[in-house]
Each structure stands twice: as C-alpha cells, then as structure tokens.
UniProtKB/Swiss-Prot annotation:
Protein name: Leucine--tRNA ligase
SUPFAM superfamilies on file: Anticodon-binding domain of a subclass of class I aminoacyl-tRNA synthetases (SSF47323), Nucleotidylyl transferase (SSF52374), ValRS/IleRS/LeuRS editing domain (SSF50677)
UniProt record, GO biological process: leucyl-tRNA aminoacylation
Gene source species: Mycoplasmoides gallisepticum (strain R(low / passage 15 / clone 2)) (Mycoplasma gallisepticum)
GO MF terms, alphabetically ordered: aminoacyl-tRNA deacylase activity; ATP binding; leucine-tRNA ligase activity
C-alpha cells in the first residue's frame, strides 16, 4: 500500500543526512542558474497559489540536473517592507522577531514539499550582513550622481504613513488614486525625498528588452511605462511678462497651428513665481480645491495671461487645468482641441476656439492626414509636417527636437521603520556626508513605538540621541531618518546568492557574504550571470523587474558585473484560483493550505497535480476531484512494481513507447509544458501495464522523470530496484531515434465508405494480405452476408474500403 507519510518522512531524512541538494561549483559542467522571485515571509505562511512557481522551477532544475548541468537553484526572503511593519503595529511586536519566525515557518513548509534548495545559500534582506551591501550600492549611486535629494510633489498615503512611488499607485473605478497595498487614498504632497535617477538608463532599459526572452506582454508594459516620445520643445512668450517664456513639449509639432490655448499644471514654476504672486485669490482657491481630488474632470481657471503663438503671433489664453501632469514633459501643454481628446474636452468646457489643421470629417481627429490652415505645412502628411515644423522652430530659435519620457526618477525614501537605513549623515548646515565602507552597515535602532506619523515625520525621528546624532571626529551629525523602500533589497538579491558560494560550510540560514566588490565576486558573477530562467508573477512588470534591471545596469556601469541584463528568460506563472474560481483570500475562505494536503494526500500528489492542472501561465481553479485523480495515478505507479516483473532483459514491445516517452518529455520540458509531461508519464505507465516484464533501465529512467514531479515516491521505487545511486545523482538517458521509426502501421477498414475496424500491419503490407485479414473478421463477415463484393479500394499503409451491393 502506498503510504505517503512514511515514504516522505523516510526520504526527507535520508536526503537531509546525505545533503544531496548541497550545491558545489563544477566548471566542467555547463551552468544553469534558475531562480524564483523570492517570497515575502508573511505570517499566514504559504498557500498552494504561492508555490506554483516554486514547483515549476523545481521541476526544471531537476531536469537540467539530470541532463548534466551544474544547476544553481537557491531561495531567500524578501523580508523588509510595509506588511511586516503593519502587522508589528497591530500586534505590538517587533518586526524582526516575527519576521524570523515567519522565515522559519516558510522554510519548514518548503522542505515538506521536497524542493531541492540548498538552504546554506539562503539570503535574508533584513540581515545586517545583507543590507550592508544594499547600503553600499546606494553609496555608489550617490557617488555617480544617480541619487539625489529634491523637494518634489509625491504620492502621500496617510493611512500607510509614507510616500509611494508612481509604480505603487493605482487608479480605482472612480478615478481616485489609491495605494497598491491596502487600496488606501493617495494624495499629492510636497516633501523632501531621496530620488534615484532611473531615467539615466531609460534608453538602455528599452533597447535591451529586444535581447531578452521575456513575454511580449511584459516587454510592452515596460516600454509603455518608460514611454519614450520623440517630439519638439516649443517656446511661447508671455504677453504681459517681459523675458518670460513657457516651454511645452509636444510629440505632435505638426499641430502647432491648431494651438488655441496653453494649459499649465498646478505647480508649474510660473504659477508659483508670477500668477500666484499676483495675489489672484481665485487661482489660489482653485488650486487648493483641486489638489486634493486627484480625479480629472477637465476643470480649469483662466489666469488672464496670454501667450504669443511662436509662428502666427496670435495671443492665446493661458489656463490652469487639472488634466496637466506636473511630472510629464514640462508641466505645460499647448491645447490643440481639434486633434487631442483631452484638449477637446477642455475647450468645449470653456468655449475655446477649435482650429482644425488636418482635413477630416469629424473632430477631434487623431490620425494621419492632409494638413490645412497651417501655412508652410499645408498639403503635407503628419510626419512631413512634424519635420518641417521642427526645422522652422530650430531656424528661428523658437524650439527644437526633444526626447521625453513618461518614466520619472524613482522616489526612494519611505517614512517607515522597517527598511534599510540610508548610509548618510547631515551636518548642521545640511551638507550630505556618506559613511565610509568600514562604517557599514547602519543598523536600525530599537524603538518602542514605530508607528508612522501622519504628518510625514518618520518613526526614526524617535530614535535615541546616540543613534540620531552621532559624533564623529568631534563633530555632531544628524542621521537620515527615512528608510529605503521594500524594493531595495530585491534589486540585487540574485547576486547575493553567489556571494555565499565561497563559504559553503555555513549552516542553513547563516548570512555570511563575500564582498560584492571583490575580485572573487566578479569571477562568480562572470560565470553565473545572467540568471538563465526567472519565474514569477507579471504583477512585478514595472516594479521589481524594472528596478532590478536598473540596478544591474548601474552595477555593469561601475564594472561590478560584466553582462548587461540580470535575467535572460522570464516566465510568468498563472494563479491557482479557489474551487469557486475566484482568487484565493482569507476573507472568502477559499485558501488551500498545502500543510493539510501534505498530510492527507502527500507532497508528491500536490506537486504532480499542480503541474498537471494546465499550462503554467494559465490561471486555473483548484479541483479536489482532479487532485484525487492524480493521487490514483501515483498509486498506479506504485502498484506497477507488484504487477510486472522488472529485470535486465530487453522488452522489444516497449522500445518505441520508451524512446518516444523520453523524446516527448524533453520537448515538453523545454517548452514548460508540465501538464503534458505528466500525460506522457501516464501513457508510458499504461504501456507498462500491458507487459508481463519491463526492462529495469527503462523503469529507472521513468523514475528519474517521475522524480522531477514526485521525488519521494520515485526514490522509494528506485530503492525497490536496488539501484545503488539516488535518483538526484543519476543522469537521464537520451532517446534513440532508431527506435522511433515504426515498422508497423495502422490501417482502417471501411464498407461503402463507413468505418468499421482498424488493425496494425507490417509497413508496406500488400492489398491481398490486408484484405484477407479483414474479410476473416466476424464484424466484416456479418456486413457482407447476402451481399456482393464488387470492388476493393486500397491505399497502402492507410485504408481499405470494400464496395458492396
């Protein structure tokens, strides 16, 4: 009887005692670096939806190992961030304490499921030896002018008590801005922040996507997020203000002749410098009323100032408008209502002139066409008119071609406690000083209260004076009291695993790292990077995946790494939904706990079922009946050993099935078609059940494949074969094409074109042999009774058709 609990407990101990998953560098083998997006260790533990990606990488890593690769497949913990801190505040516990408890629980769960991780390589972003190097990278960014402080308008979430990056803000169905985490209201607020100049790498971040084997949807999301626009910078003089101009960016310079107004964002420099200082109370009140509400209503106010059209010299009104973004372009837009939907809505609202400059039947018209009302552009198409307009602007010093990006520099400060401290000091004049490498890491001080301040003052402001105001060389300094965002540690963790490869004697969970900037580290990076396969959710497309690429490109720039991209291939797994076909959540009560299933069905059943559910990238509902069906398949494999004799003799009847099995599973694994691999295992086992004896080598190689999915059961059956080597140490045999050339063919028999029978014949059997066989079958005989056979139609190796009357 297949007792999964006894089998899994037995082999877990043997594997642990023999340390079969302990990684060793072997440069005589090709390397294969495969990685999961490391998890945040929440207090809830893992549910089956979390582990789908881990199961996929486990299967691939075992397969690559069986093919002779030197496979690196580590795991770690992304443990800083808001969730831990929120939980700490709610329970009045320190986040460090329960974070470690959660990590221990996650590790135990992963071990139960039989993953082949070497836990000596485990990384923890909250460990001081780890974030020392996060701080070191920040220092290098600052030294290369890629980190700076600025007073900028930020996304402020009062409930979370922190600033959020643009990538962390969503828009709800009512047009309100909300936080990605918790769906709390987000408003705009001006604060002094640390910012990383990700825009310096914008072109590389777009151009290098072409070389990556990533889903096209993820590439498109990153391209659209960066949103490179080639357009024109155009200068408009202000009628009432001498020597003052408003610069606008437009990707449609060809529509300049259709500009009938200018629209400014609420915090455009001229709003602060001139319009507000004119003591226009209506404008002040308008800004106050509309700054809180983030929704676009196409509301505006006339400033009573006019701009002078750079070509026609016509005066056009200047408005403030709620649809103008301060952080895109210049914060000023030339309104062309006839050829822009937003400008059209605004112009209709305020009865502004609509000037068509492209011939069309209906406006607003946004496509290509013949230009009209445009002086030297009349008769030209869009591209021709754009180039001619830019040339005119350049010649008359009124503007020039310009490249613009939607991507903003990354706001890198968080007003929270549970994050990496900045390696920065300020003197009494607010001059910035970086700590020396020897002074890293900067550790978090112990606080009794780390609740966020709703006014934006970070919890670290409550630290003791010794931490907050260190004295160095008899000079008093002030520490930075913001912390880094939760994304910081995950920007480089794929390198951190490699920094542990030179100290493989450390125990599970120890955190000793080689220096990131050492020659030995460079040697390891050159050998193992980039990651060959990265698996994780598509929700990280413009967050972690973009940030990690940015940091890696910077590390390439300063010659820490040689390659330009961290992840060669990316796969996004789909979700496992609850049995009610909705996303698993505690509130819905549809979470499937793997710990319960390990006890009731076994880890092997869970692993095999999850991989058998369907395509990896599909989101599919959990089905308990299908889980039970997978369990029955594993029982069928187990029982085979009592049904057939397994020996060293060659069973010619299985040659085709065996070699076809090996060929197909390799093809399916190359394409990450795990469900089809399980199907092929079922087909091969069915073929084995038709035999009285099966070759031991064939069964051993089947067990190697089974071990990718059900390692415990496979190892138990391998021991029954008395094989001296554990499956994880074996190599998978290659198929032989010679056995895949079939010497037989299936021929169907029809009567008057209606199908009756099929039978297997030797290849190229002649008509007489085939006809004699079918004419002697009872079914055919009955159909021919009292009938006359008038004709036989025979197509060699395919079909025979008897025509009767």
């Amino acid at each position: 009887m297949y007792n999964h609990n006894l089998i899994e407990k037995k082999w877990a101990k043997i594997w642990n005692d023999q340390k079969i998953y302990s990684f060793q560098i072997d440069k005589n083998k090709p390397k294969y670096y495969i990685l999961d997006m490391f998890p945040y260790p929440s207090g809830k533990g893992l549910h089956v939806g979390h582990v789908k990606a881990y199961m996929a990488t486990d299967v691939i890593s075992r397969w690559k190992n069986a093919l002779g690769f030197n496979v690196l497949h580590p795991i770690g913990w992304d443990a800083f961030g808001l969730p831990a801190e929120q939980y700490a505040i709610q329970t009045n516990n320190h986040p460090a304490k329960f974070t470690q408890e959660n990590i221990n629980n996650f590790r135990t769960q992963l071990k139960r499921l039989g993953f082949n991780y070497d836990y000596r390589l485990e990384v923890d972003t909250t460990n001081k030896n780890y974030f020392k190097w996060t701080q070191w990278i920040f220092k290098k960014l600052y030294e290369h002018d890629l980190a700076y402080q600025a007073d900028i308008e930020v996304n402020w979430c009062e409930q979370l008590g922190t600033v959020l990056a643009n990538e962390e803000v969503l828009t709800d169905e009512n047009g309100n801005k909300i936080s990605e985490r918790g769906s709390y209201p987000v408003i705009k607020k001006k604060m002094r922040q640390w910012v990383l100049k990700i825009t310096a790498f914008a072109d590389q971040l777009i151009d290098d996507l072409e070389n990556l084997n990533w889903p096209n949807s993820i590439k498109a999301m990153q391209v659209n997020w960066i949103n490179k626009s080639v357009g024109a910078s155009i200068k408009f003089e202000i009628d009432q203000l001498d020597n003052q101009t408003i610069e606008v960016f437009s990707s449609r310079a060809d529509t300049l002749f259709g500009a009938s107004f200018l629209a400014l964002s609420f915090d455009h420099p001229l709003v602060k410098q001139k319009l507000i200082t004119d003591k226009n109370n209506a404008i002040e009140q308008f800004i106050k009323d509309n700054s809180i509400d983030q929704r676009v209503r196409y509301q505006g106010i006339n400033t009573n100032y006019f701009a002078i059209h750079p070509i026609t010299k016509k005066k056009i009104p200047i408005y403030l408008a709620d649809y103008i973004l301060s952080d895109y372009g210049t914060g000023a837009v030339m309104g062309v209502p006839a050829h822009d939907e937003r400008d059209y809505q605004f112009a209709k609202q305020y009865d502004l002139e609509i000037i068509p400059v492209i011939k069309a039947d209906q406006y607003p018209y946004l496509l290509d066409g013949e230009h009209i009302n445009s002086e030297f552009n009349n008769g030209l198409n869009n591209e021709q008119a754009i180039q001619k307009t830019i040339a005119y602007l350049r010649e008359h010093n009124l503007g020039d071609q310009k490249i613009n990006y939607k991507l903003r520099d990354w706001i890198f400060s968080r007003q929270r406690y549970w994050g990496e401290p900045f390696p920065v000091l300020f003197d009494e004049e607010d001059n910035i000083y970086l700590l020396k490498d020897s002074e890293l890491p900067v550790e978090l001080p112990q606080l009794s209260d780390f609740s966020p301040n709703k006014d934006g003052l970070p919890p670290l402001a409550n630290a003791d004076d010794q931490w907050l105001h260190p004295i160095i060389d008899q000079k008093k300094y002030r520490r930075e009291i913001n912390t880094m965002p939760q994304w910081a540690g995950s920007c480089w963790y794929y390198l951190a695993y490699l920094l542990k490869l030179t100290d493989l004697n450390q125990a599970d969970g120890d955190q000793n790292y080689l220096a990131l900037n050492s020659e030995k580290a460079k040697e390891l990076f050159d050998h193992f990077m980039p990651v060959d396969l990265y698996v994780g959710g598509q929700e990280h497309a413009v967050l972690h995946l973009l940030y990690a690429r940015f940091w890696y490109k910077f590390l390439h720039h300063i010659k820490i790494v040689s390659s330009t991209e961290p992840f060669s291939q990316l796969i996004n797994q789909g979700m496992i939904l609850g049995e009610d076909n909705t996303k698993m959540s505690k509130s819905k009560g549809n979470i499937i706990n793997p710990d319960d299933l390990v006890l009731s069905h076994g880890a092997d059943t869970i692993r095999t079922y999850v991989m058998f559910m369907g395509p990896l990238n599909a989101s599919l509902a959990w089905n308990s009946n299908a889980l039970n069906g997978t369990r029955k398949f594993l029982e069928r494999v187990y029982n085979l050993f009592d049904r057939v004799e397994i020996n060293d003799s060659i069973n010619q009847n299985l040659n085709y099935d065996y070699h076809n099995f090996l060929k197909k599973i390799n093809k399916h694994l190359e394409n990450f078609e795990f469900n089809l691999v399980v199907s092929e295992m079922m087909i091969f086992i069915n073929a084995c059940y038709k035999q009285t004896q099966v070759n031991k080598e064939m069964i051993t190689n089947f067990l190697i494949v089974l071990s990718f999915f059900a390692p415990y059961l496979a190892e138990e059956l391998n021991s029954k074969l008395n094989n001296p080597t554990l499956l994880y140490k074996m190599r998978l045999a290659q198929w032989d094409e010679a056995y895949l050339v079939k010497n037989t063919t299936t021929i169907s028999c029809s009567i008057n074109g209606k199908f009756k029978l099929v039978h297997e014949f030797d290849l190229d059997s002649d008509e007489q042999e085939v006809a004699n066989y079918f004419l002697n079958q009872d079914l055919i005989k009955r159909n021919l009774e009292n009938k006359k056979l008038v004709k036989t139609i025979f197509v060699k190796n395919k079909v025979i058709n008897f025509i009767i009357k």
